[in-house]
């Protein structure tokens, strides 16, 4: 929690105003932030200075793991995070590759589970990683990559957190996640949860012990219409004790995650938080 608040304060104190062409808004911006999550000791990085809807973050991650490309499928899992980008993004609404209402195109999990090969067919990146790690193999390239410039025009949004690199040391699994851009007030509380949970769940289904997850953010920013709430409300609140995160031990394979797993298979204990803050969202 401290590293999250330190980053928020750093942006407020040291950030530079940058015009964002996509949203038409200014952002207070800093470059490079490194966060670390201790998954081994269940130090769950859930924001306490406002209510964080962690279940929606887990649902979104589960949708990526399943390779979903439709906002309706994400809603069925328990999150509406893709509704706006799928249905309210003018550029995407006028894109000939859009297949209709709720279609997201070839984004995130589609790239992770079905990266198109130039000679035809697809590569299932996640399946390869899970198979390798289960066998105790780390080829120094256990990388799940969502960033495919050749297909940006075929999706509603470029990936923000675009790379997840898993590494094995003996029987301990580590994760390095890289994020090109982060809406800190709205997005970071989601992204922290997802990095943590991704390492925890991958360790569980591959039979490894979770270690640390390292989260690098390149462009960290606060939109101008979010600044007052961050500076004068959230940063004035005292952080509370961190909760603990739990996963159903019956989840034992990638196939489990693809089929029967729901949000009921994840739970948090001891989550105390301040009141919610309704930060504006920029499409």
Curated annotation (Swiss-Prot):
Is this entry keyworded Repressor?
no
Pathway listed for it is: Pyrimidine metabolism; dTTP biosynthesis
- Binding residues annotated for dUMP, in chain numbering: 22, 180-183, 191, 221-223
Catalytic residues in the record: 160 (nucleophile)
Q: Which GO terms describe its biological process?
A: dTMP biosynthetic process; dTTP biosynthetic process; methylation
- Mind telling me which CDD domains this protein's record contains? TS_Pyrimidine_HMase
Protein EC: 2.1.1.45
InterPro entries from the UniProt entry: Thymidate_synth/dCMP_Mease, Thymidate_synth/dCMP_Mease_dom, Thymidate_synth/dCMP_Mease_sf, Thymidylate_synthase, Thymidylate_synthase_AS
Catalysis: reaction(s): dUMP + (6R)-5,10-methylene-5,6,7,8-tetrahydrofolate = 7,8-dihydrofolate + dTMP
- Name a single GO cellular component: cytosol
Q: Which residues are (6R)-5,10-methylene-5,6,7,8-tetrahydrofolate-binding? A: 183, 282
**Gene3D superfamilies associated with the record:** Thymidylate synthase/dCMP hydroxymethylase domain (3.30.572.10)
The record describes its quaternary structure and partners as: Homodimer.
Instruction: Write down the HAMAP family for this protein, in alphabetical order.
Output: Thymidy_synth_bact (MF_00008)
Q: What does the function comment of this entry state?
A: Catalyzes the reductive methylation of 2'-deoxyuridine-5'-monophosphate (dUMP) to 2'-deoxythymidine-5'-monophosphate (dTMP) while utilizing 5,10-methylenetetrahydrofolate (mTHF) as the methyl donor and reductant in the reaction, yielding dihydrofolate (DHF) as a by-product. This enzymatic reaction provides an intracellular de novo source of dTMP, an essential precursor for DNA biosynthesis.
Name of protein: Thymidylate synthase
Name the species this protein comes from.
Answer: Vibrio parahaemolyticus serotype O3:K6 (strain RIMD 2210633)
């Amino acid at each position: 929690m401290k590293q999250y608040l330190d980053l928020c304060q750093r942006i407020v104190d040291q950030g530079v105003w940058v015009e964002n062409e996509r949203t038409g808004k200014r952002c207070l911006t800093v470059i490079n932030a490194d966060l670390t999550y201790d998954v081994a000791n269940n130090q769950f990085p859930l924001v306490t200075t406002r209510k964080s809807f962690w279940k929606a973050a887990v649902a979104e991650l589960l949708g990526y793991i399943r390779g979903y490309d439709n906002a309706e499928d994400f809603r069925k899992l328990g999150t509406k995070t893709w509704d706006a980008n799928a249905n309210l993004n003018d550029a995407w609404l006028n894109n000939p590759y859009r297949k209709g209402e709720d279609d997201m195109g070839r984004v995130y999990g589609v790239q992770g589970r079905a990266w198109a090969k130039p000679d035809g067919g697809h590569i299932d990146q996640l399946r390869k990683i899970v198979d390798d790690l289960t066998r105790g193999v780390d080829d120094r390239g256990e990388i799940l990559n969502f960033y495919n410039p050749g297909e940006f025009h075929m999706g509603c949004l470029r990936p923000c957190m675009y790379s997840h690199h898993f590494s094995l040391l003996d029987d301990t699994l580590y994760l390095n996640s890289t994020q090109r851009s982060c809406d800190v007030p709205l997005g970071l509380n989601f992204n922290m949860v997802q990095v943590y949970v991704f390492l925890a769940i991958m360790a569980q289904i591959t039979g490894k012990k979770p270690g640390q997850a390292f989260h690098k953010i390149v462009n960290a920013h606060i939109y101008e219409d979010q600044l007052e709430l961050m500076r004068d409300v959230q940063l004035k609140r005292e952080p509370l004790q961190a909760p603990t995160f739990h996963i159903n031990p019956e989840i034992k394979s990638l196939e489990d995650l693809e089929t029967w797993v729901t949000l009921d298979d994840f739970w948090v204990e001891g989550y105390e938080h301040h009141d919610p803050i309704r930060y504006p969202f920029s499409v």
